[in-house]
C-alpha cells in the first residue's frame, strides 16, 4: 500500500505448539475475519475476508500449510477502490471471493454502501490492485469461475443463485443472467461458489442466515447452466442440529473449497465462538476442515459435517507450530504499521503520524459515536481471554478533549478508558460505557503524571479496565459486562476492535496524543 502507514511491520509473534503433525487449532484465523475465500497457486494458498466499514478493505493472507496464515496486504487500499462514507457495521464491503487465472489474481466483492458488485485484479498480490471494474449482475457475495477462456459470475439477486458470463477486465456481460438454483428452502441463499470435478459442476452455497441456523448446501449439474440437482445428504455442514447444539463453535457456513497439491480437499468457513450464553464478541472467524471427496461423489466435511476447536486431520504439509496472534509494538517511524491495523471508514491520513518514538493521533470533533471519520486506529480482539495495554501522552489538548483505548463494537456500543483534559490543564482518567442512548461514566480520577498506561482485559463475561502511572503497578478502575457489546445485543456483522483514538470537544480544537506502545496477548 503506497504512502499509508500500513506497510510491513516487524511483529513479535508468539507461537504455540501443535500436538503432532496431524493436529491443529481452530479458528486458524481468530477474530473478526469472516466470509473466507481461498485459492491455491502452485503450493501456496491465498485467502481473503470481508471488512464491512473498516479500511483498508479485504485482508489478503498467504499460507503454505493451510494452518499458519501471514497477512501480506489488503486488496482495497485506496478510496478510489472503496468509498465507505457513512458505512456502518452492517454495510460496506461484504463477502469477497479470490480466484487466480492465467497469471492474474481476481478479487470480487460487494460495496453495499455504494456501487454494488465489482472486482479488482493484479499480477502481484503483494502489490497494488486495480481500480474497480463494476459489474451489472446484482445481489451480494459474488464469485468467479474460469474455464476454457470463459469467466462466469455467480451471486444471489432476487433470493436465488444467478449465473452470467462476463469479461473480467471490463465488466461487460457477455451472456445474460439466469437463475440456476434456489437452494433447499433455507433462508437467505447466498455465498455461491462453483467448482468442476469429475465432469460435474458443483455449486456450494450457504443458507439459513449467518447465525445459529447457518448451513452449507450443494447441488451439481453436468452443464454449468443447469439444471442443478441437490445433494440428497444436504446440508453438507452445519452446527444447527442436535449433534452440535452444545459445541463451542456455532454458525458454521459461508465456505470455500480448495484442493492441495497432494490431492486432498479442504474447506475454509466462518463460524463464531459463544462465550457467555449465546453471546459472541470476537466476530465471525476463519475455520479449517478436511473434506473427503471421492470420484463422482459428494464432498463430506470432516466426516460428520461439523468442526471442533481441536482438530485431527492428515494435513498436506507438516505443521510443527501454530501461530498465536500476540503482538508487542513500540511505535516508531522506523517501523511502519502492520497490516492488522485498521481505520473506521476512509481515514484522514494527515491525522496519523509515526514519529521517532510514538504514533501521533490528531483528533477532530468526529467522535467514536459519529458516522463521520473519527481519529481511530485499532486491531481485532482475537482471543476470548486477553490483555491489551498502551501508554500515551495527551500532549496538546483543549478542555474536554480526549484520547485513549476503546473496546469498540460499533458507534452505538463501546467501552472506553481515556484521558480528558480539564480547565486547569491537567488530565482526568475517565472510564465510560456507551450503549445506544445510554451513556454511563463509571469512573473519573485526577491524574498526577502525564504519560499513564491504560489496560483492558477480557474474559468470557467481563471487560476490566486498569491504569498505571509507572507501567508496573496497575489499579482496576472499571468492569463491564461483555454481553452488551456482543453481536447478539449490538447487532451488525463485525467483532470487537481494540482501538486507539483521539477526539476534540470543540470544532476549533485539534488535540494531539502520542501513543508509545501497544501490547496484546492471550491470557490462558
Please provide the spans of the model-predicted regions.
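Sec-dependent N-terminal signal peptides
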Residues: 4-13
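C-terminal segment of classical bacterial N-terminal signal peptides
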Residues: 13-19
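Carbohydrate-active catalytic/glycan-binding domains of CAZyme proteins
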Residues: 20-524
Amino acid at each position: 500500500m503506497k504512502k499509508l502507514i500500513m506497510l510491513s511491520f516487524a511483529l513479535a509473534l508468539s507461537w504455540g505448539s501443535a500436538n503432532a503433525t496431524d493436529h491443529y487449532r481452530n479458528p486458524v484465523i481468530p477474530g473478526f475475519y469472516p466470509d473466507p475465500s481461498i485459492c491455491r497457486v502452485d503450493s501456496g494458498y491465498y485467502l481473503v475476508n470481508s471488512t464491512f466499514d473498516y479500511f483498508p478493505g479485504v485482508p489478503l493472507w498467504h499460507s503454505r500449510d493451510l494452518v499458519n496464515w501471514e497477512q501480506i496486504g489488503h486488496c482495497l487500499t485506496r478510496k478510489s477502490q472503496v468509498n465507505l462514507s457513512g458505512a456502518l457495521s452492517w454495510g460496506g464491503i461484504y463477502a469477497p471471493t479470490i480466484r487466480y487465472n492465467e497469471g492474474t489474481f481476481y478479487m470480487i466483492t460487494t460495496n453495499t454502501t455504494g456501487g454494488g458488485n465489482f472486482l479488482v485484479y493484479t499480477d502481484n498480490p503483494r502489490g497494488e490492485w486495480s481500480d474497480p471494474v463494476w459489474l451489472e449482475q446484482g445481489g451480494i457475495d459474488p464469485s468467479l469461475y474460469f474455464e476454457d477462456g470463459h469467466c462466469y459470475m455467480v451471486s444471489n439477486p432476487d433470493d436465488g443463485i444467478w449465473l452470467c458470463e462476463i469479461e473480467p477486465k471490463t465488466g461487460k456481460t457477455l451472456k445474460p443472467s439466469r437463475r440456476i438454483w434456489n437452494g433447499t428452502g433455507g433462508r437467505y441463499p447466498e455465498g455461491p461458489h462453483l467448482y468442476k470435478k469429475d465432469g460435474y459442476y458443483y455449486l456450494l452455497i450457504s443458507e439459513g442466515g449467518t447465525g445459529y441456523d447457518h448451513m452449507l448446501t450443494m447441488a451439481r449439474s453436468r452443464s454449468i447452466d443447469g439444471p442443478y440437482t441437490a445433494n440428497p445428504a444436504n446440508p453438507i455442514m452445519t452446527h444447527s442440529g442436535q449433534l452440535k447444539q452444545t459445541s463451542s463453535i456455532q454458525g458454521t457456513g459461508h465456505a470455500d473449497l480448495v484442493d492441495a497439491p497432494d490431492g486432498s480437499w479442504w474447506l475454509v468457513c466462518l463460524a463464531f465462538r459463544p462465550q457467555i450464553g449465546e453471546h459472541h464478541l470476537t466476530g465471525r472467524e476463519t475455520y479449517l476442515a478436511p473434506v473427503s471427496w471421492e470420484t463422482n461423489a459428494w464432498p463430506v466435511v470432516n466426516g460428520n459435517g461439523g468442526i471442533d476447536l481441536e482438530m485431527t486431520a492428515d494435513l498436506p504439509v507438516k505443521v510443527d507450530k501454530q501461530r498465536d496472534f500476540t503482538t508487542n509494538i513500540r511505535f516508531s517511524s522506523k517501523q511502519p504499521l502492520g497490516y492488522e491495523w485498521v481505520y473506521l471508514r476512509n481515514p484522514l491520513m494527515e491525522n496519523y503520524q509515526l514519529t521517532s518514538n510514538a504514533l501521533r493521533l490528531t483528533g477532530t470533533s468526529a467522535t467514536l459515536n459519529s458516522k463521520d471519520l473519527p481519529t481511530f486506529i485499532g486491531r481485532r480482539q482475537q482471543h476470548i481471554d486477553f490483555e491489551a495495554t498502551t501508554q500515551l501522552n495527551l500532549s496538546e489538548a483543549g478542555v474536554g478533549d480526549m484520547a485513549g483505548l476503546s473496546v469498540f463494537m460499533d458507534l452505538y456500543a463501546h467501552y472506553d478508558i481515556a484521558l480528558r483534559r480539564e480547565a486547569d490543564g491537567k488530565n482526568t482518567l475517565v472510564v465510560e460505557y456507551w450503549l445506544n442512548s445510554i451513556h454511563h461514566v463509571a469512573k473519573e480520577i485526577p491524574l498526577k503524571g502525564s504519560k499513564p498506561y491504560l489496560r483492558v482485559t477480557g474474559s468470557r463475561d467481563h471487560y476490566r479496565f486498569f491504569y498505571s502511572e509507572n507501567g508496573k503497578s496497575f489499579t482496576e478502575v472499571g468492569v463491564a459486562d461483555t454481553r452488551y457489546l456482543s453481536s447478539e445485543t449490538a447487532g451488525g456483522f463485525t467483532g470487537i476492535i481494540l482501538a486507539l483514538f483521539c477526539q476534540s470537544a470543540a470544532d476549533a480544537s485539534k488535540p494531539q496524543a502520542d501513543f508509545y506502545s501497544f501490547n496484546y496477548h492471550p491470557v490462558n
